[in-house]
């Protein structure tokens, strides 16, 4: 009776454990489904990021080209203005004695203003290129961080799945032992027949011995 009670308690414990395991498997399936949805979303995001990366790369290349053109133009204009200023100064020094210095100063101011304007345009183009590069680096960093987080989540779910499988194996072993104890192996008929023959022989021997004594 004590063994039956212990077996009943063990069976109840196994049933509770099996129910918890079923709940854990259900939770794991739900989590796996959510992970699949998240992975699909991540793939879509990756595709969008790839498109964004391609677009940003094209914009960076275009802006870099424009910046190079603007810088080259600025250098050419600066060299041309320096040559023009030198020529004007030389020409006015030769032809107009009294007005040369005033006019040369005015022309120099105009040339400096033009040079400043060209340099400002070139600097603005360079700043825009740097801004686009920063945006690209930020998007790329966010993508890599998100991918790393999902990789950690996949590892955690894999560990949970392994623990559930190991728990299933540990639960199945006591259930098999309990089934064997509840259904013992029946004795062979030969064992019973041998026991009956032995008892019959002993009875006959006792009868013959009593006959001799009396």
Curated annotation (Swiss-Prot):
The subcellular location is:
Membrane
Source organism superkingdom: Eukaryota
Q: Report one GO cellular component.
A: membrane
The region called Disordered is annotated at 1-31, 180-214
sequence repeats span which residues?
A: 1-14, 15-28, 29-42, 43-56
Task: Give the main localization category.
Answer: membrane
Q: Which UniProt keywords apply?
A: Membrane, Repeat
Region labeled 4 X 14 AA tandem repeats — which residues?
A: 1-56
Residue ranges under compositional bias (Basic and acidic residues)? 188-203
Q: State the name under which the record lists this protein.
A: Membrane antigen containing repeating peptides
Tell me what organism the protein belongs to: Leishmania major
Q: What is the lineage of its organism?
A: Eukaryota, Discoba, Euglenozoa, Kinetoplastea, Metakinetoplastina
